[in-house]
Amino acid sequence: MALSRTHRVVAGVAHTRVYKKIWKYWYPLMTRGLGADELVFINWAYEEDPPMDLPLEATDEPDRCHINLYHRTATQADLSGKRVLEVSCGHGGGASYLTRTLGPASYTALDLNPAGIKFCQQRHHLPGLDFVQGDAEDLPFEDESFDVVLNVEASHCYPRFPVFLEEVKRVLRPGGYFAYADIRPCTEIAEWEAALAAAGLQQISHREINAEVLRGIDINTPKSRERVKRHLPIFLRAAGRNYIGATGTPPIPPDAKR
């Protein structure tokens, strides 16, 4: 997936120690400013060719392309009857969908954003689904607590990615699974892959999904632009379109991989 200029700056900041201070204020602001009640997914989009055509409830249909990425990532493992942890759950749309459709025994969704967690606790009420405020680099759970750990388009914001991977390994039970999707500029791919290789986790599958994400963004662009126009003041709209990933946000060079 390509990075816009705004995303380049954000990605650079994400690898510094000021990261938590920035995200500490940005995500609560987004929760309030972009209309959280309709924005239950904050991951970018995904669609295959031919389309995945997942059977969705009518209330899920507007978020189809967001759900596609969650579904494709999570179904790399069997969640049925499993203890699942999602790290960086955003506004909880993915947690809700996966809990309703894939039958985990329990689903714990964690995020650093306290406003987002409060929203999730008020919005998503399902048996076995729990939302917790916490840090991806210091997970507040006992060793070997989960069968599956899920992370969707979030770890590029972690300043200490190897520490996050250590935490994933710590909370996974023996034989557990880490299901993961994210983005890096091409200049950081080698470092990214080296960190994954050093984490002590066996890689079972891997694929690049640039085309699928761009296709999903194209489909979602009209809705994304309307959402930005409705909820953000004029001087923030360009940054908002860049952040949410709308077709035509300049520049989008082909120098990143997912």
Swiss-Prot record:
Q: Which GO terms describe its molecular function?
A: sterol 24-C-methyltransferase activity
The answer to keyword Methyltransferase applying to this record is: yes
Keyword presence, Lipid metabolism? yes
Keywords noted in UniProt = Lipid biosynthesis, Lipid metabolism, Methyltransferase, Transferase
Q: What is its EC number?
A: 2.1.1.-
Q: Which domain of life is it from?
A: Bacteria
> Biological process GO annotation list?
methylation; sterol biosynthetic process
User: Which InterPro entries does UniProt cross-reference here?
Assistant: Erg6_SMT_methyltransf (IPR050447), Methyltransf_11 (IPR013216), PthPhpthDimycoMt (IPR054877), SAM-dependent_MTases_sf (IPR029063)
Membrane-spanning residues:
none
Q: Which family does it belong to?
A: Belongs to the methyltransferase superfamily. Phthiotriol/phenolphthiotriol dimycocerosates methyltransferase family.
Described by its record, this protein's role is as follows: Catalyzes the methylation of the lipid moiety of the intermediate compounds phthiotriol and glycosylated phenolphthiotriol dimycoserosates to form phthiocerol dimycocerosates (DIM A) and glycosylated phenolphthiocerol dimycocerosates (PGL).
Name assigned to this protein: Probable phthiotriol/phenolphthiotriol dimycocerosates methyltransferase 2
- Provenance organism: Mycobacterium ulcerans (strain Agy99)
